[in-house]
Amino acid sequence: MKILVVDDERDIQTLFEQRFRKEIRDGSVQFAFAFSGEEALAYLNGHEAVLILSDINMPGMSGLELLSHIKHLLLKPPPVVMMITAYGDAENFQTAKQLGADDFLTKPVDFNLLKEKLKQIH
């Protein structure tokens, strides 16, 4: 499963790679990382992802703006999009849902919960 993680915090890459070491080693999960909404869109122009995990609050293009762009790209098959935020902000969640987000996670990410959600997608 190809997963695109979009977050302006660069240490997120190390965190995901540590938590999914076994899945990366056996090839069941592949990660790509973008550190801005703009990088994510550039990646999606030439690659596909089954799942996109995007932070909501990022400098420049926010995760909500990215979500809107992703839905307009009409990717086939459409990726599942999960939004991640450090804030349990009901307003952001509602806006993301209206823009087409499939699910939500809060920071710090509960990786056991994320792995369960991945099983439902895969």
Each model region followed by its residue ranges:
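Helix N-cap/capping motif at the beta->alpha junctions
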Residues: 33-42, 63
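Alpha4 helix (beta4-alpha4-beta5 surface) of REC/receiver domains from two-component response regulators
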Residues: 65, 88-103, 113-116
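A short, hydrophobic beta-strand element within the central beta-sheet of small alpha/beta folds
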Residues: 78-88
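A Lys-centered signature of the CheY-like receiver
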Residues: 107
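Two-component/phosphorelay signaling modules centered on CheY-like receiver
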Residues: 10-32
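Active-site residues of response regulator receiver
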Residues: 7, 55, 85
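Active-site beta3 strand of CheY-like receiver
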Residues: 47-53
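Receiver (REC) domain active-site loop signature in two-component systems and cognate sites
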Residues: 58
